[in-house]
Every structure is written in structure tokens, then in C-alpha cells.
């Protein structure tokens, strides 16, 4: 019984590690890509796929394009040492 519980816990942990998520960011100004149609959004899906590849997904969350199913080294908002609009 304990072995089954441990295996289940490990599988759940592995599932959370493999998929990175985050806001798509403009490298020049450090800002998130904005969107206004919350939820499923063709613009966000298209931009996430262009930046991160065919396997990425995307939708509008809190007026920013949120990308899913990213590779671990994917760069997402916030950029280190760079604030939006130079602030």
C-alpha cells in the first residue's frame, strides 16, 4: 500500500515538472504581450506557437498572453533585470 502511494506521488510530481508556463514577453521592452479577449484567444495561441514551437498552447489570462507546454529553457515574463517600459 505504501509503495502504491509513493509511486502515485512521484508520478504527480513528474507531471508538474515537465511543463513550463508563463507570459510571453517582448525582449526589447520587457513587457508582456497584451490581449483583451480573455480565455481562448487566436492571437495568443498564434504568438505562443511562433515563439515557442508547434507544441505550445496559449490563451489570454489577466490581459496578457499566457503560454503553456513550454520547454524548460523558455524565456517568459518577467525578464531578469529588465522592467516593462524601463521602470
Curated annotation (Swiss-Prot):
GO terms for cellular component: extracellular region. CDD domains: neurotoxins_LC_scorpion. One of its GO terms (molecular function) is sodium channel inhibitor activity. It is found in: Secreted. Has the structural arrangement of an alpha-helix connected to antiparallel beta-sheets by disulfide bonds (CS-alpha/beta). Disulfide bonds join 31-84, 35-60, 44-65, 48-67. The modification Asparagine amide is found at residue 85. Residues 20-85 form the LCN-type CS-alpha/beta domain. Belongs to the long (4 C-C) scorpion toxin superfamily. Sodium channel inhibitor family. Beta subfamily. It comes from the Eukaryota. This is Toxin Cll4. Keywords: Amidation, Disulfide bond, Ion channel impairing toxin, Neurotoxin, Secreted, Signal, Toxin, Voltage-gated sodium channel impairing toxin. Residues 1-19 form the signal peptide. One of its GO terms (biological process) is defense response. Expressed by the venom gland. Beta toxins bind voltage-independently at site-4 of sodium channels (Nav) and shift the voltage of activation toward more negative potentials thereby affecting sodium channel activation and promoting spontaneous and repetitive firing.
Amino acid at each position: 500500500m505504501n509503495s502504491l502511494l509513493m509511486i502515485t506521488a512521484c508520478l504527480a510530481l513528474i507531471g508538474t515538472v515537465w511543463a513550463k508556463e508563463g507570459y510571453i514577453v517582448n525582449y526589447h521592452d520587457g513587457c508582456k504581450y497584451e490581449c483583451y479577449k480573455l480565455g481562448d484567444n487566436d492571437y495568443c495561441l498564434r504568438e505562443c506557437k511562433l515563439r515557442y514551437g508547434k507544441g505550445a498552447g496559449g490563451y489570454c489570462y489577466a490581459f496578457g498572453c499566457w503560454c503553456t507546454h513550454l520547454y524548460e529553457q523558455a524565456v517568459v515574463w518577467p525578464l531578469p533585470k529588465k522592467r516593462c517600459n524601463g521602470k
